[in-house]
Amino acid sequence: MLQRDNSGASTSRRLLFIVRGAADVDNIAPVIWACSREQRPVVVVMTSSRAKQLVTTTPWITEATNITLIESLTDDEPRSLRTRLRRLLHHRAAARRLLTRYAVGLLCVEWGELPRRESGPILMRVRRWLLNDVVSQLKYAAQDLGLPLVAVPHGHSTKTVMIRSEHVERIMAHNSGKLPFADRDAYDAYVFASAYHRDAILAQSTMVGGNAKVWGSARFNDLWVPRLYAQASTWTPPDTARGRRIALFFVPKWNNLVNRQATLELMAEIARSAVLHLVIRGHARESDSGLSSDEYRSLQATGNATIVSGAMSSASLISGCDVLVDIDSSIAFDAVILEKPYVRPRYLQDASVTTIWDDLGGAHQTDSASATIGLLESARLTVAPRDLSFADVVFGGRGHEVLDRYQKELWSLVDGPASNHSASTTASE
């Protein structure tokens, strides 16, 4: 088990971050970076092989002298016997010992449920005590020790309403028309990237929201995005793209009220264009936004489509494309920050879904396939205009302000309300 302790003999209370996979690393990494800039000790627990691979190949993390890395792989193949046996090593008492050993003063995780205090039959409680995943065990242990728990955003949202997909409707139908998020009220802080996303969640859930905080987006801002893209590997387009405008199309999450057939037809039209080359990228959660084997073969048969998956990062692909085509992913914010043209074929999503693009601009929104193709093929494709308030409303302000806010708010929770601690090194340095 990897366990690198760079904290030396320091007795300072520490922030502990948990990263479960690629999405967690993407969204929590900027918070870790901001908080570690103070040179106070930070602990990062990795619970999957993918998280470990990403964290241990990030230079600024591996070179930091105040970041301790701990490997607790209980999220790989969760139903396998090997994983179940491994979880026995991370039972509740072991989780408490870990928090005590590293003098943890606060536990920071991505959004998610907060397990309630133990209830139910004794055998069920014993099973949870022994076999729960390490994230749940650490959350329970933090509650046992009276440590603050903070949930930071899982990405961001382009939507100003909650999408009422079939899955969401089923859950709400069993909970008096609301999403059952009341357990989120038990966090010391449940952080949102924007006020409009907070309002959408609170309006449709049982969460009261007294602990709901808007700190801005650590992942999407004008400080972190350029830093992230500067570290991305170079993606080389195929020879078939030479002399053509490269249109990068992110496959949407189909359950977000997206017209799948019309989306595939638009992809095929782009691939048939004489001046465009289609590059398709699936979402990080492939089961939500993948292509079937038949769809894959049909697009490949055009001879003018490149389908990318696996290790190639979204940052590398966006850097290498000429225009981004996307329906509702927050990855479009990267294009806006990088001043790259972004086209949103809004006709592909149900009209009930309203977005920040409708309110503040930033996207070329089209209402038909022909209008989309016409725009993509236009001789001069520029960045869509946006309201002057866009960065403040969507990202929470300038990047150095946002990351400094995360740093100060989290350390203040560690130090307690009576602390006069102030940052000696800001996140903007």
Task: Show where each model-derived region lies.
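C-terminal amphipathic helix plus adjacent low-complexity
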Residues: 2-4, 373-429
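Nucleotide-activated donor-dependent transferases that construct or modify glycoconjugates
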Residues: 4-22, 110-113, 248-251
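Short acidic, S/G/P-rich loop/turn micro-motifs used as interaction or catalytic elements
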Residues: 22-25, 51, 113-117, 253-258, ...
